[in-house]
Amino acid sequence: MIPYLGPLDLFPPVEMAREDMGGLLAVGGDLQPDRLLDAYRRGIFPWGTVEGQPLWYSPNPRMVLFPEEFRLTRSLKKTLRSGKFEVRFDSNFRGVMANCASTPRPGQDGTWISPEMKHAYTRLHELGWAHSVETYEEGVMVGGLYGLAIGHMFYGESMFSHRTDASKVAFAHLVDYLVNNQFGMIDCQMYTDHLASLGGREIPRDAFQARLSALTASGSPRTVWSTDPLDPAR
Protein backbone atom coordinates (compact mmCIF):
# COMPACT_ATOMS: atom_id res chain seq x y z
CA MET A 1 0.00 0.00 0.00
CA ILE A 2 1.46 3.36 -1.04
CA PRO A 3 1.13 5.94 1.78
CA TYR A 4 -1.09 8.94 1.09
CA LEU A 5 0.18 12.27 2.43
CA GLY A 6 -2.20 14.81 3.87
CA PRO A 7 -1.25 18.50 4.06
CA LEU A 8 0.63 18.09 7.36
CA ASP A 9 1.97 14.54 6.94
CA LEU A 10 5.71 13.92 6.86
CA PHE A 11 7.40 11.69 4.28
CA PRO A 12 7.84 8.03 5.22
CA PRO A 13 11.40 6.62 5.38
CA VAL A 14 12.92 6.20 1.92
CA GLU A 15 13.46 2.51 2.67
CA MET A 16 9.69 2.08 2.25
CA ALA A 17 9.87 3.01 -1.46
CA ARG A 18 8.47 0.32 -3.76
CA GLU A 19 11.32 -0.98 -5.89
CA ASP A 20 8.80 -2.87 -8.04
CA MET A 21 7.24 0.53 -8.89
CA GLY A 22 10.43 2.39 -9.78
CA GLY A 23 10.98 3.69 -6.27
CA LEU A 24 7.50 5.13 -5.65
CA LEU A 25 7.35 6.19 -2.00
CA ALA A 26 4.17 8.21 -1.45
CA VAL A 27 1.27 10.05 -3.07
CA GLY A 28 -0.22 13.39 -2.14
CA GLY A 29 0.93 16.30 -0.05
CA ASP A 30 1.62 19.47 -1.99
CA LEU A 31 4.29 21.27 -4.02
CA GLN A 32 4.91 24.16 -1.65
CA PRO A 33 8.56 25.28 -1.34
CA ASP A 34 9.04 23.95 2.20
CA ARG A 35 7.79 20.47 1.27
CA LEU A 36 9.85 20.34 -1.91
CA LEU A 37 13.04 21.40 -0.13
CA ASP A 38 12.38 18.88 2.64
CA ALA A 39 11.84 16.18 0.02
CA TYR A 40 15.09 16.88 -1.82
CA ARG A 41 17.08 16.97 1.42
CA ARG A 42 15.68 13.50 2.17
CA GLY A 43 16.53 12.14 -1.29
CA ILE A 44 12.92 12.27 -2.52
CA PHE A 45 11.61 13.96 -5.64
CA PRO A 46 8.20 14.47 -7.31
CA TRP A 47 7.64 12.89 -10.70
CA GLY A 48 4.21 13.13 -12.24
CA THR A 49 0.75 13.21 -10.69
CA VAL A 50 -2.33 11.01 -10.32
CA GLU A 51 -5.64 12.86 -10.19
CA GLY A 52 -3.73 16.03 -9.39
CA GLN A 53 -1.77 14.46 -6.51
CA PRO A 54 2.07 14.47 -6.67
CA LEU A 55 3.89 11.15 -6.87
CA TRP A 56 7.06 11.02 -4.74
CA TYR A 57 10.02 8.78 -5.59
CA SER A 58 13.24 7.52 -4.05
CA PRO A 59 14.67 4.93 -6.46
CA ASN A 60 17.28 2.30 -5.67
CA PRO A 61 19.83 2.38 -7.22
CA ARG A 62 20.18 6.12 -7.80
CA MET A 63 21.65 7.69 -10.94
CA VAL A 64 24.26 10.32 -10.07
CA LEU A 65 27.13 12.13 -11.69
CA PHE A 66 30.17 13.20 -9.72
CA PRO A 67 31.41 16.45 -11.32
CA GLU A 68 35.00 15.22 -11.53
CA GLU A 69 33.79 12.19 -13.53
CA PHE A 70 32.06 14.24 -16.25
CA ARG A 71 32.99 12.80 -19.64
CA LEU A 72 33.96 15.59 -22.02
CA THR A 73 34.19 13.94 -25.44
CA ARG A 74 36.45 15.17 -28.19
CA SER A 75 33.48 16.22 -30.33
CA LEU A 76 31.87 18.16 -27.45
CA LYS A 77 35.17 19.86 -26.67
CA LYS A 78 35.37 20.92 -30.31
CA THR A 79 31.83 22.34 -30.14
CA LEU A 80 32.64 24.26 -26.95
CA ARG A 81 35.75 25.78 -28.49
CA SER A 82 33.97 26.74 -31.69
CA GLY A 83 32.03 29.49 -29.95
CA LYS A 84 28.90 28.42 -31.81
CA PHE A 85 26.73 28.70 -28.72
CA GLU A 86 26.37 31.40 -26.08
CA VAL A 87 25.68 30.08 -22.58
CA ARG A 88 23.82 31.99 -19.87
CA PHE A 89 22.79 31.13 -16.34
CA ASP A 90 19.37 31.97 -14.89
CA SER A 91 18.41 34.18 -17.83
CA ASN A 92 15.15 32.42 -18.80
CA PHE A 93 14.08 29.86 -16.21
CA ARG A 94 10.45 29.82 -17.31
CA GLY A 95 11.46 29.35 -20.93
CA VAL A 96 13.67 26.38 -20.07
CA MET A 97 10.85 24.69 -18.15
CA ALA A 98 8.40 25.33 -20.97
CA ASN A 99 10.78 23.80 -23.52
CA CYS A 100 11.52 20.80 -21.29
CA ALA A 101 7.77 20.21 -21.00
CA SER A 102 7.01 20.54 -24.72
CA THR A 103 9.99 18.67 -26.22
CA PRO A 104 8.97 15.14 -27.38
CA ARG A 105 11.01 12.30 -25.84
CA PRO A 106 11.35 8.70 -27.07
CA GLY A 107 9.14 6.31 -25.12
CA GLN A 108 7.40 9.11 -23.22
CA ASP A 109 3.76 9.98 -23.80
CA GLY A 110 3.16 13.56 -22.74
CA THR A 111 5.09 15.27 -19.95
CA TRP A 112 5.28 15.08 -16.17
CA ILE A 113 6.01 18.84 -16.05
CA SER A 114 2.47 19.98 -15.35
CA PRO A 115 1.38 23.61 -14.88
CA GLU A 116 1.50 22.96 -11.12
CA MET A 117 5.10 21.75 -11.43
CA LYS A 118 6.04 24.81 -13.47
CA HIS A 119 4.54 27.09 -10.84
CA ALA A 120 6.26 25.25 -7.98
CA TYR A 121 9.74 25.29 -9.50
CA THR A 122 9.40 28.86 -10.72
CA ARG A 123 8.68 29.80 -7.11
CA LEU A 124 11.82 27.93 -6.00
CA HIS A 125 13.74 29.87 -8.66
CA GLU A 126 12.39 33.15 -7.31
CA LEU A 127 13.54 32.09 -3.84
CA GLY A 128 17.05 31.31 -5.10
CA TRP A 129 16.93 27.50 -4.93
CA ALA A 130 16.20 26.50 -8.54
CA HIS A 131 18.50 27.44 -11.42
CA SER A 132 18.72 27.13 -15.18
CA VAL A 133 21.45 27.07 -17.79
CA GLU A 134 20.54 28.21 -21.30
CA THR A 135 22.27 27.72 -24.64
CA TYR A 136 21.68 30.33 -27.36
CA GLU A 137 22.42 30.35 -31.07
CA GLU A 138 22.23 33.76 -32.74
CA GLY A 139 20.14 35.04 -29.84
CA VAL A 140 17.62 32.16 -29.90
CA MET A 141 17.47 29.69 -27.02
CA VAL A 142 18.14 26.23 -28.48
CA GLY A 143 18.97 24.17 -25.41
CA GLY A 144 19.08 24.20 -21.65
CA LEU A 145 18.50 22.51 -18.32
CA TYR A 146 17.21 23.28 -14.85
CA GLY A 147 17.49 21.91 -11.34
CA LEU A 148 17.92 22.73 -7.65
CA ALA A 149 20.98 23.60 -5.59
CA ILE A 150 20.99 22.87 -1.86
CA GLY A 151 24.29 23.30 -0.07
CA HIS A 152 26.89 21.59 -2.27
CA MET A 153 24.39 19.29 -3.96
CA PHE A 154 22.78 19.85 -7.37
CA TYR A 155 19.56 18.06 -8.32
CA GLY A 156 19.10 17.85 -12.08
CA GLU A 157 15.47 17.92 -13.19
CA SER A 158 15.24 18.08 -16.98
CA MET A 159 16.98 19.28 -20.12
CA PHE A 160 16.09 19.96 -23.75
CA SER A 161 17.92 20.43 -27.02
CA HIS A 162 16.82 21.82 -30.38
CA ARG A 163 20.33 21.69 -31.88
CA THR A 164 23.00 19.00 -31.80
CA ASP A 165 24.99 19.24 -28.53
CA ALA A 166 23.01 22.26 -27.28
CA SER A 167 22.00 20.62 -23.99
CA LYS A 168 25.42 19.00 -23.60
CA VAL A 169 27.06 22.42 -23.88
CA ALA A 170 24.76 23.70 -21.13
CA PHE A 171 25.59 20.66 -19.01
CA ALA A 172 29.34 21.14 -19.52
CA HIS A 173 29.08 24.72 -18.29
CA LEU A 174 26.97 23.56 -15.34
CA VAL A 175 29.59 20.98 -14.35
CA ASP A 176 32.34 23.58 -14.64
CA TYR A 177 30.38 25.89 -12.34
CA LEU A 178 29.78 23.08 -9.84
CA VAL A 179 33.44 22.04 -9.77
CA ASN A 180 34.56 25.61 -9.14
CA ASN A 181 32.00 26.02 -6.34
CA GLN A 182 32.87 22.76 -4.56
CA PHE A 183 29.67 20.86 -5.38
CA GLY A 184 30.12 17.17 -4.68
CA MET A 185 27.36 15.39 -6.61
CA ILE A 186 24.63 15.80 -9.22
CA ASP A 187 21.44 13.83 -8.64
CA CYS A 188 20.31 12.48 -12.02
CA GLN A 189 17.50 10.45 -10.41
CA MET A 190 17.05 7.56 -12.86
CA TYR A 191 19.26 5.83 -15.42
CA THR A 192 19.32 6.95 -19.04
CA ASP A 193 21.86 6.10 -21.73
CA HIS A 194 22.32 9.83 -22.35
CA LEU A 195 23.35 10.52 -18.75
CA ALA A 196 25.60 7.46 -18.72
CA SER A 197 27.36 8.78 -21.83
CA LEU A 198 28.15 11.97 -19.90
CA GLY A 199 29.72 10.05 -17.00
CA GLY A 200 26.69 9.31 -14.83
CA ARG A 201 26.47 6.04 -12.92
CA GLU A 202 24.17 4.25 -10.52
CA ILE A 203 24.98 3.93 -6.83
CA PRO A 204 23.06 2.18 -4.02
CA ARG A 205 20.44 4.34 -2.32
CA ASP A 206 22.12 4.07 1.09
CA ALA A 207 25.37 5.41 -0.39
CA PHE A 208 23.44 8.24 -2.02
CA GLN A 209 21.68 9.10 1.25
CA ALA A 210 24.95 9.13 3.19
CA ARG A 211 26.56 11.60 0.77
CA LEU A 212 23.39 13.67 0.60
CA SER A 213 23.33 14.42 4.32
CA ALA A 214 26.84 15.89 4.26
CA LEU A 215 26.44 17.84 1.02
CA THR A 216 23.16 19.54 1.97
CA ALA A 217 24.26 20.52 5.48
CA SER A 218 24.95 24.15 4.51
CA GLY A 219 21.72 24.58 2.58
CA SER A 220 21.08 28.27 1.97
CA PRO A 221 19.81 29.63 -1.37
CA ARG A 222 22.43 30.90 -3.82
CA THR A 223 20.23 33.58 -5.45
CA VAL A 224 20.91 34.19 -9.15
CA TRP A 225 23.85 32.42 -10.72
CA SER A 226 26.09 34.30 -13.12
CA THR A 227 27.61 32.88 -16.28
CA ASP A 228 30.85 31.08 -15.48
CA PRO A 229 33.70 32.88 -17.24
CA LEU A 230 35.85 29.75 -17.24
CA ASP A 231 36.15 27.50 -20.28
CA PRO A 232 34.82 23.97 -19.66
CA ALA A 233 36.81 22.77 -22.69
CA ARG A 234 40.14 23.80 -21.16
UniProtKB/Swiss-Prot annotation:
- Reaction(s) the record says it catalyses: N-terminal L-lysyl-[protein] + L-leucyl-tRNA(Leu) = N-terminal L-leucyl-L-lysyl-[protein] + tRNA(Leu) + H(+); N-terminal L-arginyl-[protein] + L-leucyl-tRNA(Leu) = N-terminal L-leucyl-L-arginyl-[protein] + tRNA(Leu) + H(+); L-phenylalanyl-tRNA(Phe) + an N-terminal L-alpha-aminoacyl-[protein] = an N-terminal L-phenylalanyl-L-alpha-aminoacyl-[protein] + tRNA(Phe)
Q: Which domain of life is it from?
A: Bacteria
Q: Which GO terms describe its molecular function?
A: leucyl-tRNA--protein transferase activity
What gene, per UniProt, encodes this protein? aat
- List the record's Gene Ontology CC terms alphabetically: cytoplasm
Q: What is its main location?
A: cytoplasm
Give compartment(s). Cytoplasm
**Keyword NAD: yes or no?**
no
Q: Which UniProt keywords apply?
A: Acyltransferase, Cytoplasm, Transferase
What's this protein's family per the entry? Belongs to the L/F-transferase family.
Among InterPro entries, the record links this protein to:
Acyl_CoA_acyltransferase, Leu/Phe-tRNA_Trfase, Leu/Phe-tRNA_Trfase_C, Leu/Phe-tRNA_Trfase_N
First-tier enzyme category under EC: transferase
GO terms under biological process: protein catabolic process
Describe the task this protein carries out. Answer: Functions in the N-end rule pathway of protein degradation where it conjugates Leu, Phe and, less efficiently, Met from aminoacyl-tRNAs to the N-termini of proteins containing an N-terminal arginine or lysine.
- EC number(s) given by UniProt: 2.3.2.6
**Any matching Pfam family:** Leu_Phe_trans
Q: What is this protein called?
A: Leucyl/phenylalanyl-tRNA--protein transferase
SUPFAM superfamilies (UniProt xref): Acyl-CoA N-acyltransferases (Nat)
